[in-house]
């Protein structure tokens, strides 16, 4: 859910986001977003609204987590902060628990991030025992777009290591609430705020008949749950048998585009190892099963067909086109699993990928076939598999750049004889030359052909299931140097989960070759701007 704003102002130490021509402000309160109108507003535009995630339970049918937070608030003496049994528990109560009895309204304002150090709550949220605490991020501010974005599922990271977990989606629900009044501490906080905010001058001819409505863009087709907090006549008369949205907003449902490709990481899990384990396990099922499973929407079903086209473009029929990760086939890793591993790497580095679509397919499939989730494959085996691919592409990048820098006019090296390898060697020579600012136009024809032949020899070894060791061995021979051995040692230390420069280089070389194969295979990669 996206909230547009035009400007910001700091008042009483809190950032307020101005919208609706100065008639309304947003501010962050414990990871939730409160929308407050200018005093003396009309009944239509004077609604106080609260948007945010609420706590639910371990499954969709229980309220274990919400009840636990209520009991902890009462146990620690925060009775006034404990919602009644009829009300949902917003995530802002987590911040009250974390800060203790001394927490005041201003202390809880200003951030989308919440700290959770209660071991039981942490385990409920990520289905793992966590001793170092969690950081729960409920949204983000995008200043360049003037937009506040609330997540439907939070991003959860380890407070100590920064490890990104897969959230238990049953634990959270996005809710809009109507407030009859603000708590006294927040009333004090905003006192005098609107005296500092000028009202935009209305046009001479106002055809709208009142205040302009504020756009809130709902980016998910699932409706936001609505609830009322308080017992005023106005709220009690509101027909809440169906989901409605505040009178002061205009809701625009933006359907998700059919394109599966994106240039940013938009997965709910943040591309964690846990999500990769699940996708690695069920990749073949979610793509190759012929009939759509119950609950699979049309967009995701179309995505399966697009993914099949992409896999055929990259690996060919029955995987006959060789590519990175060929060594993994000896361990029983399928073509689809290798494709998932590649998309994971591209997503990690915000290169064009379809990992989010794959994860949505997995979530939909598990919703229909829950027994397909367990047991997950060994995390070490999955990590080793994805690390093999990033290391192969990493050593390729390093060796290509050395070859274009230091190739001498010696006897030419025999090429591989493979049309695909020779074509990609020519592309890689140009790509590596651009990366190292080497002017191929200044080299002779024979020197350039020699570069391409040497790159083809390295590429052929990688594609022939010999891995980084085989690539280094042939590179030592054609370069007449032991430098590739040192490169192997460096490459062996990188992983698909780190942020090292060598890992970035591997991701970019992987992306370049994969995108060229998609292009040659007739797969259009259209990135939707969200």
Swiss-Prot record:
Chief location category: virion
Keyword Membrane (UniProt): no
GO cellular component: host cell cytoplasm; host cell nucleus; viral tegument
UniProt superkingdom: Viruses
Key words, A-Z: Host cytoplasm, Host nucleus, Virion, Virion tegument
Record carries keyword Transmembrane: no
InterPro entries reported for this sequence: Herpes_UL21
Subcellular location per the Swiss-Prot or TrEMBL entry: Virion tegument; Host cytoplasm; Host nucleus
Residue ranges that the Swiss-Prot or TrEMBL entry lists as coiled coil: none
Assembly information from the UniProt record: Interacts (via C-terminus) with UL16.
Similarity comment: family membership: Belongs to the alphaherpesvirinae UL21 protein family.
Functional note: May participate in DNA packaging/capsid maturation events. Promotes efficient incorporation of tegument proteins UL46, UL49, and US3 homologs into virions. May also play a role in capsid transport to the trans-Golgi network (TGN).
Protein name: Tegument protein UL21 homolog
Record lineage: Viruses, Duplodnaviria, Heunggongvirae, Peploviricota, Herviviricetes
